[in-house]
Structures are given as C-alpha cells and as structure tokens.
C-alpha cells in the first residue's frame, strides 16, 4: 500500500476499539450564575491493587481514589514470569498490592522482588497479605452483590440487582471475582478515604470499569525518557515546592493543549497505553481530521471554551456521598452540566458518522437537563456564596420563606422591644438593644457602666445575667424569654430545613451519577482530540494510515516533532522498513551529523501514530508494531548500583529477549562504554543473532561509529541488511553537514572536526589525528617523549647550521644581535 496523507476528507467514524464496561456520564455547557468559581486542590490519588495468579491466569482489580471507581481486568493468561502483571504495575503504579497469603511460588518470588526494589519510582508499593478465606469465590460474589452502591437504585429488588451487576462484572471469571471480593474486603478494613468518618459511612464506590491491556504496544520507561515523550523538571516558582515538578520540553508538553484536568489525565493515559487497535485509532483520527477542516475552526474553538467548564465531577459526587458538599461544588456542577448540554447541542449538528459525536448526542441524556433544572431552581448561588452555606431560592418551601420573612423583619421589631425594655430599666442606663444570636436566642444588651467592676455589679433586678462581651452586658429578660418561645431559633431551623432540601437534591443527583460519569469520559476524550487537532494545525502534521498488510513503518519526509521547534531549519528524512527487505538498517556518519535525531524521529512518529495523533511527516503508513525498544541513552542512577555499560547491556537484553518480528528496535552507539574491540564484538553478536531469525527479525535501526563493522564485513550479506549514512561534504578544513540520509557507508567519523568545534586545543587534536592515522595504517604509535626528543634534535641542527653559515671575517657582523635574535630564542626549545 502506498503512503498517503489526506488532510481534507471527513471519513466515517468507527466506534472506539476498547469498550469500557463502566457507567456513562454526560456533560454540560453554559455560564453559571455569578460568583467566584472555586476549584479545590485535588488530593493525591491513591491506587490499591488486588491481584491473584493461579494455573497460568491472572485476575486483577484496583480502586482509584481520584474517581472512586473500581477497575477490573477479566482473567488473562500470564506465564510464570508474570510479565503481564509487571506491565499493569508499571502503568497504574499502585500504592499497595493486596493478595492472598496462600500463593504459588512464582507469585511469591515476584512479590519478594517487587518489595525489594529500592529504586522503584516514585516508590515501591506496600505488599498486603490477607487470609486466603477472604478470597473465596462464593464469599467474594456475595460481597459484590451485597455492596451498597450509589449508582444502584434502592428500589431495585435483589434479583434486579444481580442482573444489573452481572451485566457489568464477569462473574464467570473466577479469579477476577475473587480479586474484586478481596479488594472490597481490604477497602472495608482499611477504610480508604473515609478514615475519619463515622463507621456507618462506607468507602464510596461510584462505578465499575473494565481495564483492558489487549492490543497495547509495549514501551518501557527508558524509551519514554530517551524519546522525551515525558520530561519532568523542577518548577521555577517558589510556591510550587510541594508539587515540585512541571512538564519540560517533551512530546506530551507540546501536544497537551487540553482545557480540563481530566482531558490532561486522559492524554497522559493514552501516551502510557499506545494501542494497535485500528478501529480505536481511526476513530480518534476521524475526529482530529474533522476539526482540521477550515470551516470547522469556529466549532472547535467554541467546544474548547465549553470544555474549560468541565470540572472534577467524581470528587463532587464523592463529597455528596459523604455529605461534605461545599457551595462551590454546586456552582461547579451547575456549570459542568450546562457545558455538557452545550456540547451535546453542538454535536447534534455535526456528522453522526463520527462515533464520538454520535456518542455525545446519544449519551448526554435528558437527565442532564433534569439535574441542571433542579440545581438552577433550588440553589440560591448569590446568597449561598454570601453566607458560605447552602441556601435555597424563594418559593421552594413556603415554611422556609415564612421563617426568612420573619427573620428579615426582626431588626425593626427588636428596636421596638428594646425601647420598651429601656423604659423599665434604671435611669442610669443610657441605652440598650435586643439582639438575636443563633443557638442562644434573644438577649438584652446593655453597655457596661463605669461602676460595673466586679461580677456582683452586673446584677440587675428582673434580669438574668448571661455573659460579658466587648464591654457589653447580655441579659435575659421576661420579654426575651417570650420572644424565644414565640419565634424560636429561626436561624437554625431555617438552616436545618435547607440542609434537608440539600440532602434530597444530593439524592436526586447521585441517582443520575452514571450520566455525569459518562459526561466526564466523553468530554475528556473530546478535549484530548481537540488538543491534538490544534497541535496538528499549528505544526503541519498529517494523518497516518494503518496497514495490517505491511510490517514496520513507511514515512515520507518525516520530522522530529521537538527538534523542528528548536532549530531554524530542519531537514526531513524518509523511512522505509516495511516488508522483509532491509530489516536491519546500519547507519554510519560523522559525529553531530544527525544519526541520533533520526533514530528518535522514527520512534516518535511511530509512537504518535500508535496513540492516534497526526504525525510530523508528509505521509506515513504504519504496519503492525507490538513494541518499541531503545538503547539510545543510559538512564543512570546511583540507587541502581550498575555501571553505565551494564545499564546499556540491560537495555539491549530487554530487546533481545522480548522483541518479535513486529517490534521496532532503536540502538545508538551500543558498545562505546567498553573496549572498542569488545564493544564491536558485542554489537556484531547482537545483530547477527537477530539476522539469524530471518523474516522473524525485528525492525532494527542501528547508529554506530564502528566503521569496522562494515569494513571487516562482520555482518552477513543479504537483503535483510541495509547500510545508510548521513550525507556530508568536506570543504577544505571544514565539514558541511547536510543532515540527509542516503545509501552508503561513512568513510570516517571526523572526530577531530567535532573536537575542534567543541573547543579542544589544536595540539591535542593534532596528536589525536596522529595516533588515529598510525593505528589505521598499522604503524606503531610513537610515544610523546620521542617526538619531543626528535624536535629538540631538529632545533639543535638548525642552530648549528646557522653558526656554520656565519662569516666571522665580515666587518658588518654583530655577534650581540646574532645571539639575542637567533641563539637565545632557540635555546628555549633545546634546553
């Protein structure tokens, strides 16, 4: 299949390739009432993983506190090396790993190694062993069916609840059910997130979601680092010391234009889970291509504005479940719902052939209108912000309205009561007032007089002294007691009734939690694709095409997505590693000629295509890729206790042991960390190992300065090997780099030119060239002291010749001048 990039077509939109067995949630879009929007600082998310392995199958479930959701993975085959489990651990990075105390030996050894990994980033998980009885199949099933979930109506019968949960949880996957049961037991015992709550408050569970690893492309952390897919660096702000890090110059950094926090999280998730699922990838590309059309630019900008109002719905729902809702939560939820409705209305006018637009149109249901209408008609945002508590609008509850009217009329009424009280007081008391204090009631307030020093001086006949505050004496009188009996504690009564209404409103919202969860899922997906479309528009990316018929990748005029932003000009290069021809590409060339940039460019373009992004190339066709391995940079760490060369060997060993015929392997300067002969031998052995696999050889790009690899013909000749070089031109003493890849082999590394560019002294460079030439021609390398002695002899001979040429009979000869100008300067090089 030929390469092609067609940026102007609107293709039919296939649906997502990896369906999530979770609850839906819609989204809204319009401005909320006035007031200051407040978004709380999110607590650090915790992930607690429960895992069981038995008879070659793995059952996994984990709880994520960021969205109060339990994720599970159906029983999956995994051999004794537990590579699948390691992949899951690398992806979700749990705080704790819960498992049965009764385990197979392979699992026990794996957990022992996991617990001993001192260098694991950010930290090693806590291993928690529970009694095996807690993982019994029947007790786990009963634990799942008897759980109290906010998304299940209390009106459901036991049979209906079983049917509902059976549609979500695969009860035929025994290990998964046991893992879910053990996880629920752990959450109940540890009380994750509700440690300080009353014991009657359970751990909030807002949904179950299916966690899928199928069709994912394997990429290790070293590859993410060397390709600069992610790059964390210290934050320059002194106020960010706690969080400490920000995203540096990285692929994620330039593509992350998401407007909501959950969009950023989803983009990071896509980056950590590149996929081979063509239906899912094309579904993402269809949306990006649609928004790249010039006529759709205004629609994209409008949606971007709406997405900025989509906030942390799971956190709000969690607070509602715990009855910890804040005033700002209602305002944020109101804006979120109306923004989601705006997105739905916009998507209704877009092509329904695109799956995402169809999903938003269908799944942003009328429940959103119901939620928005309830909040808008009940919550008095202006008054709530003023009083910093939940208050309701007028005409919601006649009893509350009546009490508020009475409370508002109190000031004038209390003024009249105070005048009557003053008439009954001693004439020495100049003034008084009647005040209302919530929880205490009505009191008579009298200014403290000069003679009122001792407590006994505060006594006034007919009044009961209560307390002294700010030089005011507060008393109960017969009239204030009558007011207490007549009016009661109005403020607290109003507050209690409004809290009751808030609880009823919370129940209405929680009953529709699935639609809110789906809002977040689809809105974050739309946010990510709008961000990728924006980057593709600004940087001139094109749509990649996927072909299961080819192996490897074909790229026409590809560019490095980061380097092209840092360089004034960038020379594009093409790549063709499809089919059985040239599976091993050996790239030679001078230092600084662009070999490493080219390797990273191939890796990054392939990675971008596997996350469903447009790519920096004129055309790109991606075949079947199941993994990307790299040996480009040594990720050194003191805690590893390994030498730089040992780290290099470990990286190559990963590729040798795990790469298949569908893997992409990028190797840069392997073998440079040891003796050149040994390094060359190791590189040759690795390449010959892969070449011996024939058509099953991975797609390998090797950049090296070991020209002997080619000159000595250490690799077998055949169609599997292809030699490439970076084009250069010698212009006198200068070396001109064209940064263009071409067929052939470099004649020299031109290390001396690179050394001169780096500022090394000329004598050092000259000596280096002399040694290099001697080795290359097979001549012995002369030590430095012999060179010095030979130079001294040459200088002595030159001075003797000058003496022999003197004409001592010449009357014009001045020996003083001869000594000062010829002999003394030469003496410094002789003595």
Curated annotation (Swiss-Prot):
Q: Name one Pfam family in it.
A: MutS_V
Q: Which residues bind ATP?
A: 589-596
Cite the GO molecular-function annotations of the record.
ATP binding; ATP-dependent DNA damage sensor activity; double-stranded DNA binding; mismatched DNA binding
Q: Does the keyword S-adenosyl-L-methionine apply?
A: no
- Superkingdom of origin organism: Eukaryota
Disordered: annotated span: 1-43
Q: Which SUPFAM superfamilies match?
A: DNA repair protein MutS, domain III (SSF48334), P-loop containing nucleoside triphosphate hydrolases (SSF52540)
Q: What keywords is this UniProt entry annotated with?
A: ATP-binding, DNA damage, DNA repair, DNA-binding, Meiosis, Nucleotide-binding
| InterPro entries linked | DNA_mismatch_repair_Msh2, DNA_mismatch_repair_MutS_C, DNA_mismatch_repair_MutS_clamp, DNA_mismatch_repair_MutS_core, DNA_mismatch_repair_MutS_sf, MutS, P-loop_NTPase
Cystine residue pairs: none
Cellular component terms per the entry's GO annotation? nucleus; synaptonemal complex
**GO BP:** chiasma assembly; female gamete generation; homologous chromosome pairing at meiosis; meiosis I; mismatch repair
**Subunit arrangement?**
Heterooligomer of MSH4 and MSH5. Interacts with HJURP. Interacts with C7h12orf40/REDIC1.
What protein family does this chain belong to? Answer: Belongs to the DNA mismatch repair MutS family.
Q: What does this protein do?
A: Involved in DNA mismatch repair and meiotic recombination processes. Facilitates crossovers between homologs during meiosis.
> Know the name of this protein?
MutS protein homolog 5
Native species of this protein? Rattus norvegicus
